Amino acid sequence: MPESNTISRLTGLRILAVDDEPDILETIVDVLDGTTVDCAKSYEEALAKLDSKAQAGGTRAHYDLAVLDIMGVDGMVLLQQTVGRGIPTVMLTAHALNPQSLKASIVDGALSYLPKEELANLAEHIDDVIEAIEKNQSPWKRVFSRLGKAFDQTFGSGWELEDPDFWSKYKSPSYGVFYHRPPSKN
């Protein structure tokens, strides 16, 4: 996909990024140029941002997307908060990269999962998620298409055989169609 389309799809989005590592947050801000990224270094700080009142109208803060670390910030608990508020969520991980955390992310409603080693590709990855949402398609099909070989290398060949029915449906182009509100650029 041409870079200009990626930039235009992301431009103006408000994103909540949560990670306990300041350098990761700095990278997220740099990679997501053209967006407004609110950073939080802890679960409590993220929850406060989610609950904060918007300046105009007194409504809750609105985010178009959340990018959450799984480990250091209670990311799986925070995932339930963002999904419960209709915020599309991408999970990041370095240390928790295993089939169990991937499955838990899917079950709890994350729309994508990205190893931190792929952080430089975050904008393209989010663009894929947004495009899938716009086309009422499963973002997970794209995740597995993009990262399936990396998962195989990390988890070992045949890792999906422990639960083949579960994994086959998330690789299907029709499964997991997005039912929350799509990101807006307002």
Where are these regions (language model features)?
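Short alpha-helical interaction/output segments
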Residues: A46, G75-L78
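Alpha4 helix (beta4-alpha4-beta5 surface) of REC/receiver domains from two-component response regulators
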Residues: V77, G84, A96-D128
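A short, hydrophobic beta-strand element within the central beta-sheet of small alpha/beta folds
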Residues: A66, M71, L79-Q100
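Acidic, metal-coordinating helix/loop segments flanking the phosphotransfer/catalytic sites
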Residues: P22, C39-L65
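C-terminal output/effector regions of signal-responsive regulators
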Residues: E131-N186
